[in-house]
From Swiss-Prot:
Keywords: Magnesium, Membrane, Transferase, Transmembrane, Transmembrane helix. It is found in: Membrane. The lineage of its organism: Eukaryota, Fungi, Dikarya, Ascomycota, Pezizomycotina. It comes from Penicillium terrestre. One of its GO terms (cellular component) is plasma membrane. This is Polyprenyl transferase macG.
Amino acid sequence: MTVSTTPKSQRNVARGVWELARLHTREAWLCWYPAIWGACVAAGMRDVSLELAPFLRLLFGIWASVTATHCAFCTFNDICDQKLDKHVERCKIRPLPSGMISTSEAVVAFICWLPVTLAITWGTLGPAVMAGFIPVWVLSTIYPFMKRIMPFPQVVLGAIIGGAVFPGWVGITGDLKDLDQALPLFFATASWVVYFDVFYATQDRPDDEKIGVKSLAVLLGKNVQILLAVLGALQVLLFAVTALRADMSLIFWVLGLGVWMVNVPWHILSLDLKDRHSGGRIFKSNIKLGLYLTGVSLLELFVVRVYDISLANMKMELH
């Protein structure tokens, strides 16, 4: 533990806790999307009849649980990375390296987030869905150390965020059976996460090379766009397999996957390795793209599952 020697005028513990948890950004959305996709695909593959009110409660539970998980482990990540962050231009202003909050205060914040995360998950989603979160929590614990020992830490991050597919799936099915049916969506999401995080990592490549931080952006250097093209094609293929197996309608195929396919080459061609901010802009574009696909998935689910069922119920009442 360390005691901060930063002048009080520069310290702001409340803001430090807020920023450690990334509550000032939209990054938590990236973890929410796969859980919603998992729920939508499960409803299609299991041919589940949905009612609007229970489904909205499920969405709220997923949002609350994923957000709390993200807050906890982003705090943990920054505790582990604080010495490295001092040497990375983009990260110097984070709460710990800037002295906004001390290490001991950050550790207390992390410890407080853990029971909050468990309570929210259990209370809003129940024990079955909570079991689906366990792999996500385990991988989130080891992720900060992967960038020190392996040249592709993005793969672990892909498994973490992609793993959110399973709690969403279980939230619809109510059990842990047939999780293998969700694997195409898991791998599609994981490949997308690796894809956008490689863009993100290009921002820090010069600093990472100096301090020995490992990433695919560092490993591949100027050849990184070849990997991005492979990952782009792979995610589109796996999303298509998922949609086919879930018998999704033209709403998803045209408005969802069609738009996604247009964005992938645009991202890759837009990357300028000489501009440090280029990768960050494309990363933010992927946050918006994920939100768009989530909206299309919910629209498709509502039109095909909820609306059709409501219409059928109205017809039965009229008869």
